[in-house]
């Protein structure tokens, strides 16, 4: 796996699923391929994106700045600086300085990532802030190692909380989660459908599913009534794709 592929993988792992994630993935691909060279426009676009947490925006801004060639005097962006200040905690800053000194001795991506993984997310963000604000310099490879270690920690905690939700025995939470998943699956089907004859069929299935979820929420239904809803939808989507000549084995 190439270095940039690895960076893209880690960064996208902390972006919530949805149309915005697809858009960010495309921007990252363009940046890494050298197709997007307007850093200012890129940062302006990032700043106004909804849904993303300030820290995620800060990390993306840091990655864009590392990758896109820019004039030396280009201003640093406040929204990135604020996100990478470790919540203003002096302890984070102290640890970030210690980590920075260790990173200065590293020359490889994996070496930097290993060193960084033993620090807290706050210290890692502060260390990125040091580098972003030009208070310290490390090689791009080492900076990417720091980025990936931070993303790994964030993704780990997201995964733990997601697992808690998925394995919860509370039937109401499970019911709501199934309805949310069915609804977002329906939305994805509508976006993928395009404008062929079979597309009308897929759109109809998706639309019915969304109406059903709406009705279930309005009248309040038994928590088990949503079981299998998303799987039924996905089966429909795969049947539609087969007719279109697209073979996607795994959506579940």
UniProtKB/Swiss-Prot annotation:
Which Pfam families does this chain map to?
A: Flu_M1, Flu_M1_C
Note whether RNA-binding occurs among the keywords.
yes
Q: Where is this region: Membrane-binding?
A: 1-164
> Where are the stretches annotated RNP-binding?
165-252
Any one Gene Ontology biological process term? Answer: viral budding from plasma membrane
Explain the purpose of this protein. Answer: Plays critical roles in virus replication, from virus entry and uncoating to assembly and budding of the virus particle. M1 binding to ribonucleocapsids (RNPs) in nucleus seems to inhibit viral transcription. Interaction of viral NEP with M1-RNP is thought to promote nuclear export of the complex, which is targeted to the virion assembly site at the apical plasma membrane in polarized epithelial cells. Interactions with NA and HA may bring M1, a non-raft-associated protein, into lipid rafts. Forms a continuous shell on the inner side of the lipid bilayer in virion, where it binds the RNP.
Subunit architecture: Homodimer and homomultimer. Interacts with NEP. Binds ribonucleocapsid by both interacting with genomic RNA and NP protein. May interact with HA and NA. Cannot bind NP without genomic RNA.
The name on file for this protein is Matrix protein 1
What is the protein's species of origin?
Influenza A virus (strain A/Chicken/Scotland/1959 H5N1)
Its organism's taxonomic lineage begins at: Viruses, Riboviria, Orthornavirae, Negarnaviricota, Polyploviricotina
Q: Which gene encodes it?
A: M
């Amino acid at each position: 796996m190439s270095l940039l592929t690895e960076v893209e993988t880690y960064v996208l792992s902390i972006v919530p699923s949805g149309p915005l994630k697809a858009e960010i993935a495309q921007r990252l691909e363009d940046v890494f391929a050298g197709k997007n060279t307007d850093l200012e426009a890129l940062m302006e676009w990032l700043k106004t994106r909804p849904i993303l947490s300030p820290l995620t925006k800060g990390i993306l801004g840091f990655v864009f700045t590392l990758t896109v060639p820019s004039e030396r005097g280009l201003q640093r962006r406040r929204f990135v600086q604020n996100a990478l200040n470790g919540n203003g905690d002096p302890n984070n800053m102290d640890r970030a300085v210690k980590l920075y000194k260790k990173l200065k001795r590293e020359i490889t991506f994996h070496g930097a990532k290993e060193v960084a993984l033993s620090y807290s997310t706050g210290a890692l963000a502060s260390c990125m802030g040091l580098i972003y604000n030009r208070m310290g310099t490390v090689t791009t490879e080492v900076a990417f190692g720091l980025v990936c270690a931070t993303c790994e920690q964030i993704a780990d905690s997201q995964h733990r909380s997601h697992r808690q939700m998925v394995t919860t025995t509370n039937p109401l939470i499970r019911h709501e989660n199934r309805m949310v998943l069915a609804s977002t699956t329906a939305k994805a089907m509508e976006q993928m459908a395009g404008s062929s004859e079979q597309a009308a069929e897929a759109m109809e299935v998706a639309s019915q599913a969304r109406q059903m979820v709406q009705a279930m929420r309005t009248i309040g239904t038994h928590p088990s009534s949503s079981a299998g809803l998303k799987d039924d939808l996905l089966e429909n989507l795969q049947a539609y794709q087969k007719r279109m000549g697209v073979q996607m084995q795994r959506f579940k």
